[in-house]
Amino acid sequence: MALKLNSADLYTTLSTRDLDASTTRAAYNALDSAITLRVFDSLSEVVRQQNTPHAAISYRFVRAMQGPAMSMVRRGIAVNTKVRQDETERFLAIRAKAQALLDTLANAVWGPEHYTVVTKTVEWFTPIGKRSQPLTPQTRTVRVESDAQRPRGLNPNSDKQVLAFFNIALHFPVEYEIRKTPQGSVRTPSANGKALRKWGQARTKGPGVDARDRTIPAVRLAAPFVSLILTIRDADKMLSVLRTPLDPDGRMRCSYNVVGTENGRWSSSKSAFGRGTNLQNITPSMRRMFCADDGQWLISPDLEQAESRLVAGLVWQTTGDDTYWAACASGDLHTTVARMTWPELGWTDDQAANRKIANTPSRELPKFTYRDISKRLGHGSNYRGTPFGIAQAVGVPPNIVEDFQVRYFKAFPALPQWHAWCKRQLLDHQYLDTPLGRRRWFFGRPNEDATLREAIAFGPQSTVGELLNLIMYKVWSRSLLPQSDPAFLPLQLLLQNHDAFAFQVPLTTHLPTIINAVNGEFNSTPITFVRGGERRDLIIPGEFVTGFNWAYADTNPDPGKWTFSDGNKDGLIKWGGSDERIRTSPAVARSADFLGRPSAPSWR
């Protein structure tokens, strides 16, 4: 049967004809396909008429990304059910311990909860008539109210309780956040992580104490409560991932949206069947249950110091200053930055000695080394972060960030010049182009700091994501070649994690050969920067880790600082030319693994 349908009278035509369900669905599917083709033809003409190639480049690139994305969606990743159960028990124990301690401390602050207990009893009685004669016995309900009290505790997931505890019981000032509602943006009291951390850092003498009394020191009164609440909330997030439904074959799958963000990075969500979760948002400590299939190695490459190198390229392209480029090319960017930021520390010409100096604790902030400060604060300063904002994100006093930025921008004066160039570009054109040809229009107010910081971060972050996806695409394409082809790679893509991807190869594969071949794709994919008549190619080397599960193995000599009690011997380690380990925990758990499993680990 052939039907000629117009979209305007589709419903009337299909509802008045005597069509079976299969034919009706076929008609709808055909119309959807026809409309999609018409939209494609129209958009293709719009793209063709553009004066710049940016739209066409981006469109072709994201269409190509559907291949590796669908490959990973269909394959999924194996889940070690034994590790999954062990981790569930571990986080349940952590949560129970933290909740018990939080309830005890909260009860000491705001005391027990007073409530009314209502007791109802049914009793028989004999009513008396008008002439004092007994009538037929009847029943009645006697209601007795009595006052009682019980431990109040504190529910960390109840904003109402948390706000009452901090703002009323502890007398901390109310923190607000802007929430979007159908009626518009509304300023409401907040008990989110940012508000909790602010309360935790505040020093006070406590409720009922005269603030002018110098005999009582101010302390961080809320710190224990904040720590416990955040611990419980983190445990709840971990448990939600651990309890995520698996597919019938025991694997976890997600769906990837290759055009899910404004800067070209992918986004991830549940699979098309409602199972799985966002696999791009799994914390490092949660990754252990995700593993390679039995008989396979798990390999994960990423771009080494990619964002810093791209900032260096953009700074040179816009200002002509290559000081930061030279620092990135030195081999140890953060030590070089520390040396240029604190020249008074007695540096030498020996790279190993300088690394040792950079790893000494800072005088102003002993819990961080000079190298740590250079890494953490330098990253935020590259994107024009304010001292207050960086201090809040890193957890250091704002004056430390202010002092660092004075030194940092003195060592690299071209960075503020690049920020100024981005501001002019934003004000004049309201768009920016990346070195890979993606153009983004910014619809926020071009004179606002938030829009400017977003524009500054766009270039490096978008380029890192698309460069890694391009390399992943080239690697995936080689896995589709015939095995007789010299360029064939015997690998299977498993995951894409914004700035890294993961694949598996058989244990029989010669690891150095595979890693050298993949690294060759990194080295053959340069990013070109042009300034006037000069061109510079930036090659960002790949950094590889190998193992059997997705979490990192604990390498700290002190077992007390391990993430996992057993050190996660099957975890990822940095590739150093060889990996002779033998797998200890299979992907498909044996029955003996469950029968001999120890009891739930205690909270620590």
Q: PLM ranges: what are they?
A:
Residues P151, V241-D247, G274, M286, ...:
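Short, contiguous acidic/charged loop-to-helix segments that flank catalytic cores in large enzymes
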Residues S255-P361:
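Function-dense linear segments that define catalytic or interfacial modules
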Residues D32, E307, S330, H334, ...:
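Hydrophobic (often cysteine-bearing) scaffold residues that line and stabilize catalytic clefts
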